[in-house]
Amino acid sequence: MTSAAAIPTVTLNDDNTMPVIGLGVGELSDAETEQAVTAALEAGYRLIDTAAAYGNEAAVGRAIAASGVPRDELFVTTKLATEDAGFQSSQDALRASLERLGLDYVDLYLIHWPVSQQGKHVDSWGGLMKSKEVGLTRSIGVANFHGHHLDDIISLSFFTPAVNQIELHPLLNQAELRAVNAEHGIATEAYGPLGVGNLLSHSAVNAIAEAHGRTPAQVLIRWSLQLGNIVIPRSSSPERIRSNIDVFGFELSEEQMSTLNGLDDGTRFRPDPETYSGS
């Protein structure tokens, strides 16, 4: 088990700190969510990532409340659903999320998808700025934003997101977008680091795992951490949750990193932000 104190943190561009690894709970049922968050907090996780669109914020809140972990030790992220896009509606949506979570504030609030064809991502960003100003969230950021989406909000608001959460794994290593994020001082947060499970049986990943006496999942998470990303693997299994955080006792070599970097072929397992208009 990894203690919470042993998990490194990164300082965001607003001077708030964020753990470099956390638990994602997308597509988990309420029961799975409560079990996963409970197991994660017991294992030393302090970053929990949910979203209004996941429908499980209340379950996250129940697990947090039952854990006994002090609020100031936690880092809770949730996200704005597309249907709530807009300046005022984004603020109202965060208040509703907080009520479901049973919290007075979140540590990070993200616009879940740009949905630029809807034309509201800039207005939503203004709403997030207001929510930060009044203390409903400590930090604000975006998810699934490409460079031009970032340019839209930064050029009009003169306020830069702290985080850009994107699909990122060896088949989609997002080198170009990571560089854009870095240029703006935006932390890159990787979701889907295991390729939604599709990379666990990849021969190159397994060879590296065998060389280190580690699991394929641990290798994939370690690869992303060594790239400088924040990583939020999703799991409902307490055993895998404990295993996924045990990634600070080994290091991939330059050759192994290069091997995994070389797998990039642009494969997405989640929607393309350029065309997606969902939640």
UniProtKB/Swiss-Prot annotation:
Active-site residues (renumbered): Y54
PROSITE patterns the UniProt entry points to: ALDOKETO_REDUCTASE_1, ALDOKETO_REDUCTASE_3
Family: Belongs to the aldo/keto reductase family.
Alphabetic keyword roster: NADP, Oxidoreductase
SUPFAM superfamilies noted in UniProt: NAD(P)-linked oxidoreductase (SSF51430)
Species lineage: Bacteria, Bacillati, Actinomycetota, Actinomycetes, Mycobacteriales
InterPro entries named in the record: AKR, Aldo/ket_reductase_CS, NADP_OxRdtase_dom, NADP_OxRdtase_dom_sf
Pfam family, one: Aldo_ket_red
Keyword Nucleotidyltransferase: no
Enzyme class, first EC level, given as a word: oxidoreductase
Residues annotated to bind NADPH: G192, L194, V196, I232, R234, S235, R240, S243, N244, R270
Any one Gene Ontology molecular-function term assigned to this protein's record: aldo-keto reductase (NADPH) activity
Protein's name according to its UniProt entry: Aldo-keto reductase Mflv_4205
Highest taxon in the source lineage: Bacteria
Enzyme Commission no: 1.1.1.-
Gene3D superfamilies: NADP-dependent oxidoreductase domain (3.20.20.100)
Keyword Cell membrane belongs to the record: no
